Amino acid sequence: RSVSRGLGDVYKRQGKAFVSGVAGERFCVRNSGAVAVVEGVGDHGCEYMTGGTVVVLGQTGKNFAAGMTGGIAYVLDENWDFYQRVNKETVSLEPVEHKYDVATLKELIREHVELTGSPRGKEILDDFSEFLPKFKKVLPYDYDHMLRVIASMEERGLDGEQAQIEAFYAVQKNK
């Protein structure tokens, strides 16, 4: 495969990007809200990412998610060695198990196949139950904590925006 996208694609962008092929290094650097699906990335993918969602349907280079403070990445780890290439200082690696995550992942791959005709994406969709356990959810620790506090506020009856505001103050108070 050749590199089809280069340095800094999706840098500070919004919207969606679907790449049938492998991207170069620093794919989705400083992503602050875009959704991207790609079939592999070079070194430093999702570096300094603050928001958005990224799906990687293949290998990553080294130092994935360095400085990532927000957003979520789903990475296919067929060789069970992704942990060696991810920068674990600010993120955790989890299985993709929650129904929201499973639905999001599957829908983004479906959209990727529909828009790009990706054989790789189709292969994964056709055998999704076999591939699902091989995906890792990359989630920043602080972002995960904030999502949990927001959910707690919503359980107390606050609406979305008010729950976010109250969660922010609660987290700041406990620092």
Where does each model-flagged region fall?
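Single conserved hydrophobic/aromatic residue that forms the stacking wall/gate
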Residues: R1-Y11
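Non-catalytic terminal/interface segments that mediate subunit docking, oligomerization
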Residues: R5, G15, Q172-K175
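Detector for repetitive beta-architecture
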Residues: D9, Q14-K16, G33-V35, C46, ...
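Alpha-helical scaffold domains
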Residues: K12, N31, L105-L108
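Feature marks extracellular polysaccharide-active and adherence modules
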Residues: S20-V22, V29-R30, V38-E39, E47, ...
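Short, glycine-/Ser/Thr-/acidic-enriched flexible segments
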Residues: V22-E25, V41-D43, G61-K62, N79-D81, ...
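Intrinsically disordered, low-complexity terminal regions
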Residues: L57-G58, A65, T69-K175
